[in-house]
């Protein structure tokens, strides 16, 4: 069984037992969280698509860790004007493990 959930402004296809990194969630390590914005649920050939959410569907997950992604370097430049700007960015994330999908 798999589901498509929305969290942090992004959509993820998840199945039980998977680990994934999502946008930072304010929860403690080891805490169980529920992802209730389930857009679709599928099993085998059957697919249930919500309008916009599947009623009564919940994905339970456990918080494994918090961290920061690798640095993304931003470099802006205007040619012939001697203008250069360097900037870096590291996005925070939360690593979760999907425990169960109920629909």
Swiss-Prot record:
Q: Which GO terms describe its cellular component?
A: cytoplasm; ribonucleoprotein complex; ribosome
Q: Specify whether GTP-binding is a keyword of the entry.
A: no
> What UniProt keywords apply to this chain's record, in alphabetical order?
Ribonucleoprotein, Ribosomal protein, RNA-binding, rRNA-binding
Q: Name one GO molecular function term.
A: rRNA binding
Query: Does the record carry RNA-binding as a key word?
Result: yes
Q: Which GO terms describe its biological process?
A: translation
One Pfam entry for this protein is Ribosomal_L21p
Q: Which PROSITE patterns match?
A: RIBOSOMAL_L21
Signal peptide interval: none
What do we know about how this protein assembles, alone or with others?
A: Part of the 50S ribosomal subunit. Contacts protein L20.
- Tell me the protein family, please: Belongs to the bacterial ribosomal protein bL21 family.
Give the protein's function. Answer: This protein binds to 23S rRNA in the presence of protein L20.
Q: What is this protein called?
A: Large ribosomal subunit protein bL21
